[in-house]
Swiss-Prot record:
Name of the protein this chain belongs to: GTPase Obg
One GO CC annotation: cytoplasm
EC identifiers of the protein: 3.6.5.-
SUPFAM superfamilies named in the record: Obg GTP-binding protein N-terminal domain, P-loop containing nucleoside triphosphate hydrolases
Organism from which the protein derives: Nitratiruptor sp. (strain SB155-2)
UniProt-listed GO biological process terms: ribosome biogenesis
Disulfide bond residue pairs: none
Segments forming domain Obg: 1-158
Binding site for Mg(2+): S172, T192
Record localization: Cytoplasm
InterPro entries the UniProt entry points to: G_OBG, GTP-bd, GTP-bd_Obg/CgtA, GTP1_OBG_dom, GTP1_OBG_dom_sf, OBG_GTPase, P-loop_NTPase
């Protein structure tokens, strides 16, 4: 099960008790103090791991504790430090104070390790308290307590391409067709109730991550339906693929404008992402009807049909595609018709999207 929001109570370890001990040796009836210090309590760290994709490993764990420090021993033997607690999280995890709502960490980079809570300091053993007036102190310090914080972890998926469309538009089918993701697919609205990630292999050494974002409806940015809960997952997606259902009762242009409006209402920044448009379920229409609807949609967007067909698009269906090297980000990179079921233009879509992904990665690395 995908979990994107979890609350935990986290404890760092308590410091170990300092020891009260006296040196015991043959012929030394009253040896001096030699109680060792207690060990420090374990710290709490967050570690970002790109191979972790969800927060589901925290399911059912309400309280997590680092180990307490061990008490000191005689002969000035220092107590063992408590074992640290390392919380492994996927990239895109945000850590909030559950009570104040304050953002504590925004964890994005793979391998990033941050100290969250320091363990309590171990108490000093009695040898520290020997003085001219007190040669045999019977006092040692207790260890300092650890820290306790209630936190909320929130995961925002980080993907190269986010699929955006109304419920049942075919996003789950597409992602299962061109990636290694195997979502459950059924023919009803809100099939996808949680975001899913798929790794799309372009070649042996080249791939990109696609996020199947749950279908949104008009008013999602205002919290209607399940929309607002899931829109946050595309905030960090680098590019967007709008998916328009050509077999739907909804007019294609109306679908597109509604989706754009929802994204803009949710985040102006998100609405400015590089984007492309896939016209889905084209196999459900007669070829002449499909051509007519595609041509009208392209004209309604004030675009000119055609472009460099370097990706091997099927010529029987009209399309619009830009040159990636002269890309105008105010327009879609492409408008192409697809069918995941009949595999129409699926490979072409994959290669075209990868060009867009490479461009976005290159620009991000040069910033």
């Amino acid at each position: 099960m995908f979990i994107d929001n979890v609350e935990l109570t986290v404890h760092s370890g308590k410091g170990g008790q300092g020891a009260v001990s006296f040196r015991r040796e043959k012929f030394v009836p009253k040896g001096g103090p030699d109680g060792g210090d207690g060990g420090d309590g374990g710290n709490v760290y967050f570690l970002v791991d790109k191979n972790t994709h969800t927060l589901s490993h925290f399911k059912g764990k309400k309280v997590l504790k680092a180990q307490n420090g061990r008490p000191g021993e005689g002969r000035r033997k220092h107590g063992k430090k408590g074992e640290d607690l390392i919380l492994i999280v996927p990239p895109g995890t945000q850590v909030y104070d559950a009570q104040s709502g304050e953002l504590i960490f925004d964890l994005v980079e793979d391998g990033q390790k941050v100290l969250f809570l320091q363990g309590g300091k171990g108490g000093k053993g009695n040898w520290h308290f020997k003085s001219a007036s007190n040669q045999r102190p019977t006092y040692a310090q207790p260890g300092l307590p650890g820290k306790v914080v209630q936190i909320r972890l929130e995961l925002k998926l980080i993907a190269d391409v986010g699929l955006v469309g109304f419920p049942n538009v075919g996003k789950s089918t597409l992602i299962s067709t061109i990636s290694n993701a195997k979502p459950e697919v059924a023919n009803y609205e809100f099939t996808t109730l949680t975001p899913k990630l798929g790794v799309v292999r372009v070649s042996e050494f080249e791939s990109f991550v696609m996020a199947d974002i749950p279908g949104i409806i008009g008013g999602a940015s205002e919290g209607k339906g399940l929309g607002l809960q899931f829109l946050k997952h595309i905030e960090r997606t680098k590019s967007l693929l709008y998916m328009i259902d050509m077999s739907s009762y909804r007019d294609p242009l109306t679908q597109y404008k509604t989706l754009q409006k929802e994204l803009k209402n949710f985040s102006e920044e998100l609405a400015k992402r590089s984007f492309a448009i896939a016209l889905t379920k084209i196999d459900a229409l007669q070829e002449d009807e499909a051509k007519e609807k595609i041509e009208k949609f392209i004209e309604d967007l004030h675009l000119n049909r055609g472009g460099d067909n370097r990706y091997g698009l099927e010529e029987r269906y009209p399309y619009f595609i830009q040159d990636i090297y002269a890309y105008d980000s105010s327009k879609p990179f492409f408008v192409v018709s697809i069918s995941a079921v009949a595999r129409i233009n699926i490979d072409a879509l994959k290669y075209a999207l990868y060009d867009l992904v490479k461009k976005e990665r290159s620009e991000a690395n040069s910033d």
